[in-house]
A protein has these predicted regions:
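Catalytic cysteine-centered active-site loop
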Residues: 126, 130, 137, 148, ...
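Flexible, active-site-adjacent loop/turn segments at secondary-structure boundaries
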Residues: 141-142, 148, 210
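Sterically constrained small-residue positions within well-ordered secondary structures
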Residues: 18-20, 62, 142, 177, ...
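N-terminal accessory/pre-domain segments preceding catalytic cores
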Residues: 1-106, 222-292
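Alpha-helix capping and helix-loop boundary segments enriched in small/acidic/polar residues
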Residues: 4, 82, 146-149, 173
């Protein structure tokens, strides 16, 4: 987040969270610009439940006066703190169910990718509604509570879980070439290299690895996404300087046409299957990810 939004916004976010947990309604913030972007972008990525608990200041255009920002409570402060703690336990429960302490960052990303493909569903009803009207109820938090969602909810939830597990992760957005439709997926940095992961496209596949640890080229290939439209985290990154987020390491190319079966932390191998031959025979394949 700091690479895209800068230190001032990250500091304001930390101050906001401290104020919420203390039951206050003011916090230190540099200026209105910092406030607007931080309040608009950070909760969904960094503490999804917060949108249910607080809102902007009553006087939205003058939310920051002399370096002090304010916000409004949607629920009593005590209830907010209790709900944040309950949400934290929910997230901890998912991570404890899916991950082991000894997992590497790659193994965490893989285990959660498979978990998403097997446990969550795409919300087609909401997707269809969005073609006809503005929908304002989608959020990462809704996805965790219902188990269904659309792309921005799903990818935000996947990236949020990875961040809580210590993996560098965020969201990436872009447009398809054939209909210009927007889409959001996850973007990770593992072993100092960047990769695209699309947990939305993985839903219901029961472990197809074609959307896991993709390069820019592979991301573009899967449903004709246009690399020049890619942007990280939010529209803010389109307007402000940030590091290059090129994903060009194709170490995981051998997995993209395989179906997952299992992986071994001890041997650093992924066991999977591939369909080949005239009669569609299934052949076992083992991928060595030593070093990851």
């Amino acid at each position: 987040m700091e690479e895209v939004f800068g230190k001032d916004m990250c500091d304001a976010w930390s101050n906001l969270v401290d104020a919420v947990m203390a039951g206050e309604n003011t916090f230190a913030c540099k200026d209105q610009h910092t406030y607007d972007w931080m309040m608009g972008q950070f909760p969904e990525h960094c503490l999804p439940i917060l949108r249910e608990l607080i809102d902007y200041a009553y006087d939205r255009e003058h939310s920051v006066i002399d370096g002090v920002a304010s916000f409004t409570w949607l629920v009593p402060p005590g209830e907010a703190k209790a709900r944040i703690e309950a949400f934290g336990k929910q997230i901890e429960g998912i991570l404890n169910e899916v991950l082991e302490d000894e997992y590497s960052d790659l193994e965490k990303a893989l285990a959660l990718y498979i978990y998403f493909s097997e446990h969550y569903e795409y919300d087609y009803d909401t997707y269809m509604q969005m073609n006809d009207k503005y929908v304002d109820y989608t959020s990462c938090y809704r996805f965790f509570q219902t188990g269904i969602g659309i792309c921005h909810e799903i990818s935000s939830a996947y990236s949020y879980l990875l961040m809580q597990a210590g993996v560098q992760a965020t969201s990436m957005s872009g447009n398809r070439g054939y209909d210009k439709a927007g889409h959001q997926w996850s973007f990770v940095r593992i072993n100092g290299k960047n990769y695209h992961i699309d947990p939305t496209y993985a839903l219901g596949t029961r472990g197809e690895l074609r959307y896991f640890m993709m390069t820019d080229e592979k991301r573009a290939e899967e449903d004709e996404y246009i690399p020049s439209t890619f942007y990280a985290v939010s529209h803010y990154s389109r307007e402000n300087p940030h590091p290059d987020y090129t994903a060009d390491d194709d170490t995981f190319r051998p997995l993209w046409d395989k179906d997952f079966e299992s992986f071994s932390h001890e041997t650093h191998t992924i066991r999977c299957w591939t369909e080949s031959g005239y009669y569609g025979e299934w052949t076992e394949f083992e991928f060595d990810y030593a070093g990851y």
